[in-house]
From Swiss-Prot:
It is an enzyme of class 2 (transferase). Keywords: Cytoplasm, Methyltransferase, Nucleotide biosynthesis, Transferase. Gene3D superfamilies: Thymidylate synthase/dCMP hydroxymethylase domain. It is found in: Cytoplasm. The keyword Methyltransferase applies. This is Thymidylate synthase 1. HAMAP family: Thymidy_synth_bact (MF_00008). Belongs to the thymidylate synthase family. Bacterial-type ThyA subfamily. DUMP binds at residues 141-142, 181-184, 192, 222-224. Pathway: Pyrimidine metabolism; dTTP biosynthesis. Its EC number is 2.1.1.45. Catalyzes the reductive methylation of 2'-deoxyuridine-5'-monophosphate (dUMP) to 2'-deoxythymidine-5'-monophosphate (dTMP) while utilizing 5,10-methylenetetrahydrofolate (mTHF) as the methyl donor and reductant in the reaction, yielding dihydrofolate (DHF) as a by-product. This enzymatic reaction provides an intracellular de novo source of dTMP, an essential precursor for DNA biosynthesis.
Length: 279
């Protein structure tokens, strides 16, 4: 059993037993297959904590870990909102939100790529500012990135689910706290928890810090009603030991990472489970 499997199952059980239904409301989300309302059971304010002795990835089902890393590179490294760039990587998880111009509007990578921070007399984006400050001002309590821009929320195809990171350097270790306003526990959460831990490992490597703690906070923590049956199956499955994530130690610049610099060894997992997408 991994740390992630244990915490994940605990949250799913809480939602199943105590979750509040939104069926009395007219909800925004619709099922991609038939356009009917996609209702949920939800609880609020959940936290997952990991000591980074193992990589947080589910073993009760197969997680498309390379796809998760490719999405991470698209947002954080390319700082892109162009879905066609993601499609070139063989990833189509954002196709349902692609607008006529081929983008997701002013969301995710668009916000990270805006040059809105002052650094030594020039404007830089949030990622470059973060990397510089972690190296040169480690004791700062302002190591924050923010995707939730109220001025541009109406220009986004989908407002960000994971919207904030805060980084801490303590005794030579890099700690990361992530905040998600909303998390679909069947599809979104397994991707997000894994990929932001990969981000922590990447940035720790290029800034020269050891890995510290990883904290993942969720505001609205929910399960879609059509996902309940398969989640019950998943929770009864055998759990395995955590795999080993290898990141190419030769990479010293954040922008030099490619998908080939990541390998996952000994990933034992249950069979893939299909969960319908709500949009």
């Amino acid at each position: 059993m991994t740390q992630f499997d244990k915490q994940y199952n605990s949250i799913i059980k809480d939602i199943m037993n105590n979750g509040i239904s939104d069926e009395e409301f007219n909800v925004r989300t619709k099922w991609d297959s038939d356009g009917t309302p996609a209702h949920t059971l939800s609880v609020i304010s959940k936290q997952m904590r990991f000591d980074n002795s193992e990589v947080p990835i589910l073993t009760t089902k197969k997680v498309a870990w390379k796809t998760a890393i490719k999405e991470l590179l698209w947002i954080w490294q390319l700082k892109s909102n162009d879905v066609t760039e993601l499609n070139k990587m063989g990833v189509h998880i954002w196709d349902q939100w692609k607008q006529e111009d081929g983008t997701i509007g002013h969301a995710y990578g668009f916000q990270l790529g805006k040059k809105n921070r002052n650094l030594n007399g020039e404007k830089v984006d949030q990622v470059d500012y973060l990397l510089h400050q972690l190296k040169n001002n480690p004791s700062s309590r302002r190591h924050i990135t923010m995707l939730w821009n109220p001025d541009e929320l109406d220009s986004m195809a989908l407002t960000p689910c994971v919207y904030e990171t805060q980084w801490y350097v303590k005794q030579g270790k890099l700690h990361l706290e992530v905040r998600a306003r909303s998390n679909d526990m069947a599809l979104g959460n397994p991707f997000n928890v894994f990929q932001y831990n990969v981000l922590q490992r990447m940035i720790a490597q290029v800034t020269g810090y050891e890995l510290g703690e990883y904290i993942f906070n969720i505001g609205d923590c929910h399960v879609y009603t059509r996902h309940i049956d398969n989640l019950k199956i998943q929770m009864e499955r055998e759990q395995f030991e955590a795999p080993e994530l290898w990141i190419n130690p030769e990479v010293k610049d954040f922008y030099d990472f490619t998908i080939d610099d990541f390998k996952l060894f000994n990933y034992k997992h249950g069979d893939k489970l299909l969960f319908e997408v709500a949009v």
